[in-house]
Amino acid sequence: MRKAINPPNAPSAIGTYNQGIETDGLVFTSGQVGIDPSTGQLVDGGIDMQAAQTLKNIEVILSSLDLGKESIVKLTVFVKNLDDFPFVNEAFKNFFNGIDYPARSTVEVSELPLGALIEIECIAIK
């Protein structure tokens, strides 16, 4: 059985999807971008600010299930420019801050929704 996850304090989905799905002890988030939930707009700044906000948005989705960032086992990161990889690494370092890093893949793409510079999908365990 699967359960849709759409917490009210996370950014609203910009398409026909749920923010996440919980099934059989696993949580899968849809791709998140650096939208500020209070404005519905991408945060100002570059890749570093968008990466930080994207990770916060994932944290909000997980916290709606009483899960923390330590439950994250895999992240798939999509960036518009692989030259931004060091900024993504720094955002991850700040976000995970002493917690073991999850597995991760990073892929360069030509475009992302809303002109975002980064999008992240998450798999977590309950």
Regions found by a protein language model. Give the residues of each.
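Short, polar/acidic, helix-capping and beta-turn segments at strand->helix junctions
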Residues: R2-K126
